[in-house]
UniProtKB/Swiss-Prot annotation:
Involved in trafficking and recycling of synaptic vesicles. It is a multi-pass membrane protein. The keyword Membrane applies. InterPro entries: TMEM230 (IPR044234), TMEM_230/134 (IPR008590). Its main location: membrane. GO terms for biological process: axonal transport; synaptic vesicle transport. It comes from the Eukaryota. It comes from Gallus gallus. It is found in: Membrane; Golgi apparatus, trans-Golgi network; Cytoplasmic vesicle, Secretory vesicle, Synaptic vesicle; Early endosome. Signal peptide: none annotated. This is Transmembrane protein 230.
Length: 120
């Protein structure tokens, strides 16, 4: 007589374990593996985009007022650098806010994964 195999994890002899055959229509997949997890929203990156957008807007307005002469300190030699810095700060903020807005509304092709996250 051969010794019976035992299930080492439970200590139960294998002859006493009941098995049931899987249904023939089972393709080996479970529904849970196809379920999409809710998107992880990068709050820090969106907050940084808001700050960049606001600072850039402020600098563009100040630069335009300097250039138009409504603010008389400095003239054109100060207006152009302020405008350039304002545009350089405004553009990334606007870009990432636009992606965040479209991702929140569920537009096709936009997701929160497109926004760089600053998780440590």
């Amino acid at each position: 007589m051969m010794p019976s195999r035992t299930n080492l994890s439970a200590g139960i002899p294998s002859s006493k374990v009941k098995y049931s055959k899987l249904a023939s229509t089972d393709d080996g997949y479970i529904d849970l593996q196809f379920k999409k997890s809710p998107p992880k929203i990068p709050y820090k990156a969106i907050a940084l985009a808001v700050v960049l957008f606001m600072i850039g807007t402020f600098l563009i307005i100040i630069g335009a007022l300097l250039l138009a002469g409504y603010i008389s300190k400095g003239g054109t030699d100060r207006a152009i650098p302020v405008l350039i810095i304002g545009i350089l700060v405004f553009l990334p903020g606007f870009y990432h806010l636009r992606i965040a807005y479209y991702a929140s509304k569920g537009y096709r092709g936009y997701s929160y994964d497109d926004i760089p996250d600053f998780d440590d």
